From Swiss-Prot:
Family: Belongs to the class-V pyridoxal-phosphate-dependent aminotransferase family.
Enzyme class: transferase
Source species of the chain: Bacillus subtilis (strain 168)
Name of the featured protein: (S)-ureidoglycine--glyoxylate transaminase
Name of encoding gene: pucG
Cofactor: pyridoxal 5'-phosphate
Length: 416
């Protein structure tokens, strides 16, 4: 007889920039029965999900569907499908995840041109536009919301410049989709990649993407169908194409599954699609602008409490993400010890950071289902208590009052 017990995980208040707490309604649909990937009931769910993703990304693109895998899988699928060896790719970098784009692009043979700025700031769009005109890249790829630094980048002028210069504009919107405005068509974004485990409050395991006909044309020129399922017509029509390097991330083959052809590629992650559909449904049910305002509101309360405690926010405030708050670790305080005590004593998880910011800041997420008043008040109370135990010179008793002031003022304004 086995002594192994059934799995039972602890309850946590997750206030990181991802993953975040999963909405209970999403967890519920994940327990519904699995159906076959070609069952009309399932293909109907696929079609519904595509339609809802178009609303989420604010686009009329034909192609809006998820990649099975983490957010990074979505990023790699898009880049793998458009980059060919020796393509010039311009990547503006203002944090860790800009460097990730360079890692992926280089592995697919691109000539990568990096444009870097100080972590905690963003670029003047004109600096990027000048570089686009100078480099004349095939692709400009950049991050919309950089969770490593808590900054968000304006995209509209860059998208317009890319269209004028005939460069494909590919945007990592993993951390912003569902929590911040992402206007794919208006900002002239050619391809965008979202994440499930952040503002959508869905477990990690799918990456919603969308792309327009400019990208679809590049993919079509590289289209292949696997030998084991290709028809004679497929082989004749596609024989001269240079295939996309990756099989799993070949968007031309995934299009055949997500279109009327329903040609098999890989076994669909059924319960993850249920989860994504429900997560996006909840976003649209709340309403995009209402949801974005909720994130701004709770972030304002959190920031007010942090500052009232006597702590400093990190980075340029003019480009702060409304879903991630970066806090400078006070001098003489062990940041990891504070995080450990928060988790052990309060069940609260906040994040550290990476690279030049490792050991210098904490990152607190207010994303999706985790973005609630009770969570904001709880993390402020817990952080204050732990810092006092660490003999930090903070203003005791002021954080919660400052956050409550934000909530009460908002309530009074709503009543007017």
């Amino acid at each position: 007889m086995s002594g192994r017990r059934e799995l039972c995980t602890p309850l946590r208040t997750i206030m990181t920039p991802g993953p975040v707490e999963v909405d209970p309604r999403v967890l519920r649909v994940m327990s519904t029965p699995v159906v076959g990937q070609f069952d009309p009931a399932f293909t109907g769910i696929m079609n519904e999900t595509m339609e809802m993703l178009r609303e989420l990304f604010q686009t009329k693109n034909r192609w809006a569907y998820p990649i099975d895998g983490t957010s990074r899988a979505g990023i790699e699928a898009v880049l793998a499908s458009v980059i060919e060896p020796e393509d010039d790719v311009l990547i503006p970098i203002y944090g860790r995840f800009g460097y990730l784009l360079t890692e992926i692009a280089e592995r697919y043979g691109a000539n990568v041109h990096m444009l870097e700025c100080e972590w905690g700031t963003v670029f003047d769009p004109e600096d990027i536009i000048r570089e686009i005109k100078k480099v004349k890249p095939k692709i400009v790829a950049m991050v919309h919301g950089e969770t490593s630094t808590g900054r968000i980048h304006p995209l509209k002028a860059i998208g317009e410049a890319c269209r004028t210069e005939d460069a494909l504009f590919i945007v990592d919107a993993v951390a912003t989709i569902g929590g911040c405005e992402v206007k794919v068509d208006e900002w002239k974004i050619d391809a965008a990649i979202g994440g499930t485990q952040k503002c959508l409050s869905v477990p990690s395991g799918m990456a919603p993407i969308t792309y327009n006909e400019r990208v679809a044309d590049v993919i079509a020129a590289r289209k292949k169908v696997e030998r084991g399922i290709a028809t004679q017509a497929d082989r004749a029509a596609l024989s001269g194409n240079r295939p996309i390097t990756s099989n799993y991330f070949d968007l031309s083959q995934l299009e055949d599954y997500w279109s009327e052809r329903r040609l098999n590629h890989h076994t669909e992650a059924t319960t993850m699609l249920y989860a994504l559909r429900e997560g996006v449904r909840l976003v649209l049910e709340e309403g995009l602008e209402t949801r974005f305002e909720r994130h701004r509101h709770h972030e304002a309360a959190l920031a007010a409490g942090i500052k009232a405690m006597g702590l400093r926010l990190f980075g340029d405030d003019s480009c702060k993400m409304p879903v991630v708050t970066c806090v400078e670790i006070p001098g003489g305080i062990d940041g990891e010890s504070v995080r450990d005590m928060l988790l052990a004593q309060f069940g609260i998880e906040i994040a550290s950071s990476f690279g030049p910011l490792a050991g210098k800041i904490w990152r607190i997420g207010t994303m999706g289902y985790s973005c609630r008043k009770e969570n904001v008040l709880f993390v402020l109370a817990g952080l204050e208590a732990v810092l006092l135990r660490h003999n930090a010179g903070i203003e005791a008793g002021k954080a919660l009052q400052a956050a409550l002031d934000v909530y009460e003022n908002a309530g009074r304004q709503a009543a007017v």
